Amino acid sequence: TLARRFSGGGAVYHDRGNINLSFIETVKQPDFVYYLQQVVDFLEKAGISAYADQRLGIYVDERKISGSAQCIHKDRVMYHCTLLFSTDLDTLNAALNGDPDAESRLPGSRTMRAVPSVRSEVANIKEFLSEPMDIKRFMHLLFHSFVDDDDNRIYRFSAGDMEAIER
């Protein structure tokens, strides 16, 4: 799936090898670099030497492994990013580069005009891991790295929350 986020940023390609991560918080003064740095720090703990650019993308060896977008609504801030773990990069590139043969790889796709994305060479995180790992294990480690941080907490939706979401 190829989508554009309402929160900005470039086009986003989704498949089962792509991890989506969001931070939502109530703050007076958002610090998007703080959220970005948490992801970079996790990757460092996983043995991946990653770095961020001024557009809040994350790179390894000059290849992009994560893009992000941010938005503010009233006193709520949302930072979200994609992590390319084991994405089909051929299909991703065909979709994002407007390959005329993308329709055969992406049934139901269609062309549309939008603000162009900033192009970057991409890579999968799994290429940089010192030991093989599947996406479920990686997500487990990622989740626990945030949960174990005292600054972060889990919010569990109540039945009332779920009803409001469904409306």
How should each PLM-predicted stretch be described?
Residues S49-Y59:
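A short glycine-rich, hydrophobically flanked beta-strand micro-motif that places a catalytic Asp/Glu
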Residues T1-P30:
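N-terminal lobe of the biotin/lipoate ligase/transferase fold
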Residues Q37-S49, S66-S68, H73-R167:
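Long, positively charged amphipathic alpha-helical accessory segments at protein N-termini or as interdomain linkers
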Residues L21, L56, C81-L83:
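A structural signal for short, well-ordered beta-strand segments
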